[in-house]
């Protein structure tokens, strides 16, 4: 099963390697139409669609107040969630900019907060600086670390919706987790 044909962070020999490697494979199982289109640029091998599986290994939703308590959050607040490995293409910079703008325009109520939970693929300091420069220190909870499986349910149970402002995407495992926890998802059109 092929997750991505093109890597999210591009390197010099990616296309050459893909042409060589994918040309040697007899067939593929892909998880999104975007991946299928990318695959067709490299090979005519047979391909079968199988959607990204749903994750059910994180348990069931827990009481929201209890989830907030476990995360050190005020249960009187309302939370939006950005979750997962933090990589440039996932658009956290866009989300922080939009949050600051909406707050300045009075379009986000004072009860709302943003939870950013996940390990940074690169240096987290640019995100931290943006939070401070935008005056969002009191509104953004930044858990820059690996989130163990047993804690995932707390984040998805504390939040009212998941935000995925991706700049590019093929499919997202984080979306499947949101489905498991029956959490609405706001996404960009990519």
Enumerate the language-model features and the residues they cover.
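Conserved donor-binding/catalytic core segment of Leloir-type glycosyltransferases
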Residues: 74-90, 96-99, 114-115
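Short donor-sugar binding/catalytic loops of nucleotide-sugar-dependent glycosyltransferases
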Residues: 83-88, 102, 119-121, 146, ...
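Donor nucleotide-sugar binding/catalytic pocket of nucleotide-sugar-dependent glycosyltransferases
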Residues: 23-64
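Nucleotide-sugar donor-binding and catalytic loop/hinge architecture
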Residues: 62-79, 106-109
């Amino acid at each position: 099963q092929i997750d991505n044909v093109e890597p999210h962070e591009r390197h010099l020999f990616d296309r050459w390697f893909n042409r060589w490697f994918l040309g040697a494979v007899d067939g593929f199982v892909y998880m999104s139409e975007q991946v299928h289109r990318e695959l067709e640029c490299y090979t005519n091998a047979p391909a079968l669609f199988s959607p990204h599986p749903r994750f059910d290994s994180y348990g069931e939703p827990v009481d929201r107040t209890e989830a907030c308590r476990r995360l050190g959050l005020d249960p009187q607040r309302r939370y939006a969630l950005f979750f997962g490995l933090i990589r440039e293409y996932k658009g956290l910079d866009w989300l922080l900019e939009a949050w600051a703008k909406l707050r300045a325009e009075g379009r986000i109520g004072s009860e709302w907060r943003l939870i950013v939970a996940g390990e940074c693929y690169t240096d987290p300091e640019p995100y931290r600086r943006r939070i401070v420069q935008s005056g969002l220190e009191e509104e953004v909870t930044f858990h820059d670390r690996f989130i163990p499986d047993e804690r995932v349910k707390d984040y998805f149970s504390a939040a009212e919706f998941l935000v995925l402002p991706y700049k590019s995407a093929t499919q997202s495992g984080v979306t499947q987790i949101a489905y498991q926890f029956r959490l609405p998802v706001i996404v960009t059109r990519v």
